Amino acid sequence: MKNSPIGVFDSGVGGLTVARTIVDQAPTESIMYVGDTAHAPYGPKPREDIIRYSTAIADDLVARGAKMIVIACNTAASVFLDKARELYDVPVVGVIEPASRRAVAATRNGRVGVIGTTGTIASGAYQRCIANLDPNIEVHAVDCPQFVPFVERGITTGRQIMGLAEAYLEPLQDVGVDTVVLGCTHYPLLTGVIQLVMGDNVTLVSSSEEEGKEVPRVLYQEDLFNDANPEAESLDVVDANVVNDYAGPEPVRTFESTGDPHRFARLARRFLGPSITQVSHVEGLTDM
């Protein structure tokens, strides 16, 4: 079980921002990544459809031996996380809890903005999670439905996306938030635009980065680090990157798409660079 891969899935390429952090934080771990581009974006879809898509993909990953499931999609995590933890005997890591913890720690004035898909914002998942952590924090949530389609088309700079960001983020500027949660794993590709609009004095919390950091913590807690990792007496040893001296077999990282694998590969290289040499079409999931 320890040497099995980590299963990661998202509605498209956005979850690769999570995969990139996992690679940085746990470099000897193998990964199976599925991007459900056949059904992207998840944001505007009905809750029942998102749960159905997510269940089919997670079932497939577990059936292929994943030792952990990472839901690298805020929309999916907002409606599927609790169900997934009931369904599977492996740890399931979501994105909302770690990002919320970071936002609560980061805010100085107690006003936090959350941006995400329509589905994520409508679910109230971030609002509830942050309120549970600190009920005194004001949470101002804004849905940004066009951000994901722009990122999926590879458009992350330029006048059009800048104008869109200014319109979406104006309500957060008006209430004076000092921290903004990027509540979609596609949004780190828009960090430059969002930071420019919000200003340097506003802290951006990447849900992707926070979820990626959560993975080695859970691996340690569940004693699931693979045999390539050193014997660690605490998580601090793992965080110290002592694994860098390991000279054993290379981890296996596979990337699959329910849609066009060639288009996925072109976009995916913006997230993980040339390490993505091949993307396969995953069979049996497109008719979910």
From Swiss-Prot:
EC top class named in words: isomerase
Binding residue positions for substrate: D10, S11, Y42, G43, N74, T75, T185, H186
Highest taxon of the lineage: Bacteria
Catalytic activity: L-glutamate = D-glutamate
Pathway annotation: Cell wall biogenesis; peptidoglycan biosynthesis
Enzyme Commission number(s) from the entry: 5.1.1.3
Pfam family, one: Asp_Glu_race
GO molecular function: glutamate racemase activity
One BP annotation, GO: peptidoglycan biosynthetic process
SUPFAM superfamilies named in the record: Aspartate/glutamate racemase
Active site: C73 (proton donor/acceptor), C184 (proton donor/acceptor)
Keyword terms: Cell shape, Cell wall biogenesis/degradation, Isomerase, Peptidoglycan synthesis
Family: Belongs to the aspartate/glutamate racemases family.
Role, per record: Provides the (R)-glutamate required for cell wall biosynthesis.
Protein name according to UniProt: Glutamate racemase
Organism whose genome encodes this protein: Corynebacterium kroppenstedtii (strain DSM 44385 / JCM 11950 / CIP 105744 / CCUG 35717)
